[in-house]
Amino acid sequence: GVGHLTLIDPDHLVSANLGRHVLGADDLGLPKAEALQEQIRKDLPTTEVTAFATFSEVVMYKNPEVFDKADLVVVTTADWQSEVALWRAKSDGTSWGLLQAWSEPHTQVGHALLAPSGAFDARSLFTDNGEFKHKFTEWPEGGVVALPACGESFIPGGSLGMVNIASMVSQTALRVLSGNIDSPSWVSSINRPDDVVMLGGKYLG
């Protein structure tokens, strides 16, 4: 199994995260990385877990040994600046592999881009603001839903679709760590494409 995990996330858990995050209501307001560290320590006491409640690029600069010791870096935060920093480092050549994963709105589709050890760069697959150029679904307003009277917004997604995507990402990561994938790969999870239209979107395939 995985003997060591380093969790990096600057965000705190908010109510909009519930249902699509492994953390629950008891963790609301807590730093995600530190709360998840505690949960993993309780559930898997044999796994060593380190947490940084900051951005990955900060850890790369202040604690470079974290990345130097890593076998695989998995980024699922959908923070484009952090993703750019990781791909910039990857393009120069690294010993660690990079797995970038995310869900499209409503979690009917998820993607994972894998770059093994070496020099690779997937930034050309995205627009300047981080939108994937080969998305499978299209939504009004880019899938962003505004919350009334508070100036906030969110991208909707259900727990069932997220479970499928999380499983796909986990399986891909384990296959990399076990040596079963050693070339650049793009893996996608498609749940119920017929539901995309029902939810107000368009399935592009």
Language model region names:
Residues 19-20, 27-30, 35, 55-58, ...:
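Charge-rich, low-complexity amphipathic helices
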Residues 37-71, 78-79:
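A structured beta-alpha segment of the ubiquitous adenosine-cofactor-binding alpha/beta core
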Residues 8-10, 52, 75-76, 101:
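Generic beta-strand/beta-sheet core signal
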Residues 14, 24-25, 31, 55, ...:
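Alpha-helix initiation/capping motif
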Residues 68-72, 77-205:
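Glycine-rich phosphate/adenylate-binding loop
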Residues 13, 57, 106:
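Surface-exposed, flexible loop/turn segments at secondary-structure boundaries
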Residues 4, 8-48:
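Glycine-rich phosphate-binding loop and adjoining beta1-alpha1-beta2 segment
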Residues 1:
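N-terminal Rossmann-like FAD-binding beta1-loop-alpha1 element of flavoenzymes
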